[in-house]
Amino acid sequence: LTNKTARFLVNGTSIPEVDFDVGE
């Protein structure tokens, strides 16, 4: 997990789609 992905995970785990978007 990168800094951006981790940030999204902490900010809201209810939006995995955004997490994947940033990860890609």
Swiss-Prot record:
One of its GO terms (molecular function) is carboxypeptidase activity. Its main location: secreted. Inhibited by DFP. Contains both N- and O-linked sugar chains. The N-linked oligosaccharides are unique structures of Man(10)GlcNAc(2) and Man(11)GlcNAc(2). Deglycosylation does neither affect catalytic activity, pH, thermal stability, or resistance to proteolysis of the enzyme. It is found in: Secreted. Keywords: Carboxypeptidase, Glycoprotein, Hydrolase, Protease, Secreted. Optimum pH is 4. Unstable above pH 8. It comes from the Eukaryota. One of its GO terms (cellular component) is extracellular region. GO terms for biological process: proteolysis. Its EC number is 3.4.16.-. Glycans are attached at residues 3, 11. Monomer. Removes acidic, neutral and basic amino acids as well as proline from the C-terminal position. Digests preferentially peptides containing a hydrophobic residue in P1' position, as well as arginine, lysine or phenylalanine in P1 position of ester substrate. Catalyzes also peptide synthesis. Belongs to the peptidase S10 family. This is Carboxypeptidase 1.
